[in-house]
Amino acid sequence: MSEYLFTSESVSEGHPDKVADQVSDAILDAILAQDPKARVAAETLVNTGLCVLAGEITTTAQVDYIKVARETIKRIGYNSSELGFDANGCAVGVYYDQQSPDIAQGVNEGEGIDLNQGAGDQGLMFGYACDETPTLMPFAIYYSHRLMQRQSELRKDGRLPWLRPDAKAQLTVVYDSETGKVKRIDTVVLSTQHDPAISQEELSKAVIEQIIKPVLPPELLTDETKYLINPTGRFVIGGPQGDCGLTGRKIIVDTYGGAAPHGGGAFSGKDPSKVDRSAAYACRYVAKNIVAAGLATQCQIQVSYAIGVAEPTSISIDTFGTGKISEEKLIALVCEHFDLRPKGIVQMLDLLRPIYGKSAAYGHFGREEPEFTWERTDKAASLKAAAGL
């Protein structure tokens, strides 16, 4: 019987790139709480002792950006100089400009050539869903995120007091080539920052027994499963001291772990007029509802936009041979049941709210948080009925 391997990774909230994402989205939320129509493109850089805030923001909100950045870094867990990054001691620089009026006229309703709210940029976005996990996400990325959430939980509640904020997980999964189903877990890689006093042996045992085994399905762990725990042997220096972190540098972790294509646009720090974010969320919503409706067991959708134009320039769907109806009919159903114009997406998913901070670590998809409207399957029944199934 033929098999193939597939791998995805996740990183913790203390990973430097994720620190940057969370600061950017915390600033976005602070602005949207006061000014839901604000235009925000908030970028963040973190390095040893330094946090740089830059980008374009047009808003009436009065926000203490430095305070928001420090509070976010502190909540993540970088609150002392011995960790190499201290929320209270690091320098924070603020370098925001306003949104270009040339861009604004294409996005503002009633301005520009298309009087509807146009897309904030050109670009292509993908959405994906499959039936491998309860939240209709690919197996490897779903469980990589769960491993990182478990690491954070045990760090914060003190059960493993030697854990530090920075960590990464990677899962290699064996699939059956004929059925496309997960057969077993081949390799688990987990690297976590730690207190220098803990031994590699003690750390490895605790990570396997208290982080990995409680999270992963036991029937998929075999005697052949390989565990690679802190394979360099030491991970004391981490976070922004170990590596410079930037907003938008973990786009595959944020989405489908490489199981679906990515259009290239990052999410964090961007208000919902940016289709990089809002249309990617809408695509996930569409794909998840198609799978939840039983119209396919695997669904990938691509949309594209032109700056200043409201209607998508293209919509395509691939169900990889699992569809109950043709892809042409699926596209027609999508056009009938989902408004994929920028303003339609914002209204459909209620996106003008301060809901983004929670999305900036552990994945934007596959988490059924009440704020994550794009994870609802409320269109599944109507799609199924319209398809005649």
Curated annotation (Swiss-Prot):
GO terms for cellular component: cytoplasm. GO terms for biological process: one-carbon metabolic process; S-adenosylmethionine biosynthetic process. The gene is metK. InterPro entries: ADOMET_SYNTHASE_CS, S-AdoMet_synt_C, S-AdoMet_synt_central, S-AdoMet_synt_N, S-AdoMet_synthetase, S-AdoMet_synthetase_sfam. It catalyses: L-methionine + ATP + H2O = S-adenosyl-L-methionine + phosphate + diphosphate. It is found in: Cytoplasm. K(+) binds at residue 43. Homotetramer; dimer of dimers. This is S-adenosylmethionine synthase.
